[in-house]
Structure formats: structure tokens, C-alpha cells
Amino acid sequence: MTRRYWNINLEEMMEAGVHFGHGTRKWNPKMEPYISAKRKGIHITNLTRTARFLSEACDLVFDAGSRGKQFLIVGTKNKAADSVAWAAIRARCHYVNKKWLGGMLTNWSTTETRLHKFRDLRMEQKTGRLNRLPKRDAAMLKRQLSRLQTYLGGIKYMTGLPDIVIIIDQHEEYTALRECITLGIPTICLIDTNCDPDLADISIPANDDAISSIRLILNKLVFAICEGRSSYIRNP
């Protein structure tokens, strides 16, 4: 895999608060190689390591994007949800930003059935057929459509398992990460100082609580995906 330059700037990361970890009492000893200092009771992440692994992740997604691979971005906590949706839409990726439904990947046949139902209901609403049903039936189906939109709206065009999954916050999305590990799907995971760096294929040590930090990491990955996709379009 060719290494590229992704304009990953340490000063920019500091301004975004990427280096701020969790309190020193809430840490995983496996994160010690990625921590540079303790300050006012919190761990400080070594941004040189962050830059290295973020660059590796950008190389990976560029390469995958240039070969037409499919991505899924997962981040369901409030601080990540909007950034995840924005990044995924910008890079034409699938995403989950509300709630991870257990078995979403490992029980793909059930997810596929739900997606078919979701698409059918969307079509019925679009054509006006829902409004021609008895009020009680229409109301029930509209509630069902609303729930499906909330939980599956970001994967409505997904027709199979993703090739790479990008995860924001290992603790919050542990179920999603375990499903990827079970299925052998490569993962890129943003990890804070309380996480296990050994679980993902590429772990990016960074603040997973600050919106500015999450957005910066996603910006770099999305740019690399878009660059890869444009390369794929030029050289199919």
C-alpha cells in the first residue's frame, strides 16, 4: 500500500483538543505507549502517534476507495451523531448514528429483511398509497416507517456487508466492534485513553468526547475516501 501525504498537522490537532484523554483513574494500561503526559488529573495523548495511525488509516481508506469498496461509519452518542451523518453523506458511505441494533451485521439476513420493509414503506409513502389506507392502519405503518428511518436510515442503500467499518468511541460501539471482529471485517477505531488499542485493525488514539476532535479525525478520513473514490472513477 502506497504511503501518501494527508496534511495531518499537530498544531491543528492541539487546537481541536485531540490530545485530551480521560482522567488518570479511568485508563487502560494498554494505552501507555500512546500517552505522553499527565496534566491536571488527565492523560495527554501523544499526537505524534495519533498522526502516524491516522495517516495509516487514510492510506487504507484511500486504497479501499480506489477499488470501489464500501464503508460503514458508526457513532451513536450525541456528540458524534451529527458529525458521523455529515461525514458519511459527504463521502457516500453508509452510517449508523442513532442506535446500533444487535446483530445488525452478524445477523445480516434479518437486517436485510428490515431494509426491504423500509424500502417498501418509503415507496408506499412516496406514491401516496399510505394515505389511502384506513387511518388506523396508515398511522401504524407511518410509526413503523419513522422507527426504521431512525435506526436504518443511514444504511438504506446497503446491499451487503461493508468492506471497512470506521468506529467512533470503542466503548460506546463495543457491540458493533465485536460483530466486525466476528465477521473479519477490517475496522478503524477512534480510541481514547480508556480503550483497548488491540481490538481494531487500526486504532487512532484521540479524544472521543470533543466534537472538534471527532470532526477533525472524520474530516481526514472522509477526504482520503473521496480522493480514493475519484481515483476509482477515473480508472475503473
Curated annotation (Swiss-Prot):
GO CC entries: chloroplast; mitochondrial small ribosomal subunit
Alphabetical UniProt keywords: Chloroplast, Plastid, Ribonucleoprotein, Ribosomal protein
GO MF term set: structural constituent of ribosome
Biological processes annotated in GO: translation
Disulfide bridge map: none
Subcellular compartments: Plastid, Chloroplast
PROSITE patterns the record matches: RIBOSOMAL_S2_1, RIBOSOMAL_S2_2
NCBIfam families in alphabetical order: rpsB_bact (TIGR01011)
Family the UniProt entry places it in: Belongs to the universal ribosomal protein uS2 family.
Name by which UniProt lists this protein: Small ribosomal subunit protein uS2c
Record organism: Coffea arabica
